[in-house]
């Protein structure tokens, strides 16, 4: 009897096989941890498992309820990987928390977010994003330094500063031309105006304001060789500093994020650089996105040389930064 009693308490002992089997199955740990780390297109999100499975029959619900952890793709650090747009996933995750859709004012990429919602199989979110927008009766946005927002106009364009819409005069006929249209059709110099808006002149309300600084380290020629032999500009790498979301918006796939891959969209970084070495190409991309240069600086240094001749091109180096702003 003593042997049987001792055997009943052992994990592999006999006699109590039925009871031990049921207790061991109930004591098994869950397949997924309560805290889940997701790598969505290079952006890292940390949330609870109950949040990602809050919508039944969605893609995330099937991933974390119907599959085994070893069946899901992971990155080098063991986080579950999703090959989707990491910037838009923040709105997907925010919706999963309380099933409410909250978007910032002047959100221009509803169609892209709707496509992400379709991928994650969230039909209610897709329906809300596809519903027509009802403009609010609130006051027009405040004046900006580069222009005045004209509410209710086609495309929500910005009128140049000094061309604000005047108050309607009493007794004016309904068919009379608007003074604002007359002002907008003339340039400040009195000539015929070209296109009213370009990205480098004024910004629509959907664009985020901010600063981006690009810099490069190069070399230049000084001395007698500068006249005798032309030396072309040498740019080894163009660095990008600023808010992560702005840098990705401007440079897109030409931005190398390998030095700072897990930076959230609203954080700042100084470790990005471009995949090309042409300054003018970077300037074009910034101009197309509505940025304009507000400052620049450059420094030149001469490395130590054993000889007194400092006219060699490799001795002299420079570092230059350009600061761009969008309002």
UniProtKB/Swiss-Prot annotation:
Auxiliary subunit of GABA-B receptors that determine the pharmacology and kinetics of the receptor response. Increases agonist potency and markedly alter the G-protein signaling of the receptors by accelerating onset and promoting desensitization. This is BTB/POZ domain-containing protein KCTD12. InterPro entries: BTB/POZ_dom, H1_KCTD12, SKP1/BTB/POZ_sf, T1-type_BTB. PANTHER family: BTB_POZ DOMAIN-CONTAINING PROTEIN KCTD12, POTASSIUM CHANNEL TETRAMERIZATION DOMAIN-CONTAINING. The modification Phosphoserine is found at residues 153, 173, 187, 202. The lineage of its organism: Eukaryota, Metazoa, Chordata, Craniata, Vertebrata. Transmembrane segments: none annotated. Interacts as a tetramer with GABBR1 and GABBR2. Residues 11-21 have a biased composition (Gly residues). The modification Phosphothreonine is found at residue 198. Keywords: Acetylation, Cell membrane, Cell projection, Membrane, Phosphoprotein, Postsynaptic cell membrane, Synapse. The keyword Cell membrane applies. It is found in: Presynaptic cell membrane; Postsynaptic cell membrane. GO terms for biological process: protein homooligomerization; regulation of G protein-coupled receptor signaling pathway. One of its GO terms (cellular component) is presynaptic active zone membrane. It holds the Pfam family BTB_2.
């Amino acid at each position: 009897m003593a042997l049987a009693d001792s055997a009943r308490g052992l994990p592999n002992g006999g006699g109590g096989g039925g009871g031990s089997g049921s207790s061991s199955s109930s004591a098994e740990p869950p397949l997924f941890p309560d805290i889940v780390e997701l790598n969505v297109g290079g952006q890292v999100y940390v949330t609870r498992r109950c949040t990602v499975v809050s919508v039944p029959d969605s893609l995330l619900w099937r991933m974390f309820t119907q599959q085994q952890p070893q069946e899901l793709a992971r990155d080098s650090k063991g986080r579950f990987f999703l090959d989707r747009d990491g910037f838009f996933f923040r709105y997907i995750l925010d919706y999963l928390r309380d099933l409410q859709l909250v978007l910032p004012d002047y959100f221009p990429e509803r169609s892209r977010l709707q496509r992400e919602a379709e991928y994650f199989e969230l039909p209610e979110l897709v329906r809300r994003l596809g519903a027509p927008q009802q403009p609010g009766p609130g006051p027009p946005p405040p004046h900006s330094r580069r222009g005045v927002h004209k509410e209710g106009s086609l495309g929500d364009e910005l009128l140049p500063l000094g061309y604000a819409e005047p108050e309607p005069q009493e007794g004016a006929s309904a068919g009379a031309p608007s003074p604002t249209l007359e002002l907008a059709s003339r340039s400040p110099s009195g000539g015929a105006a070209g296109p009213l808006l370009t990205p480098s002149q004024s910004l629509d309300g959907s664009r985020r304001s901010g600063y981006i600084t690009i810099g490069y380290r190069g070399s230049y020629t000084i001395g007698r060789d500068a006249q005798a032999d032309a030396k072309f500009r040498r740019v080894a790498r163009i660095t990008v500093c600023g808010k992560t979301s702005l840098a990705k918006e401007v440079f897109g796939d030409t931005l190398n994020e390998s030095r700072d891959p897990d930076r959230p969209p609203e954080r700042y970084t100084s470790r990005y650089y471009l995949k090309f070495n042409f300054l003018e190409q970077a300037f074009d991309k910034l101009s197309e996105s509505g940025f304009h240069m507000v400052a620049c600086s450059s420094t030149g240094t001469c490395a130590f040389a054993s000889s007194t001749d400092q006219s060699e091109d490799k001795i002299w180096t420079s570092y230059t930064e350009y600061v761009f702003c969008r309002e």
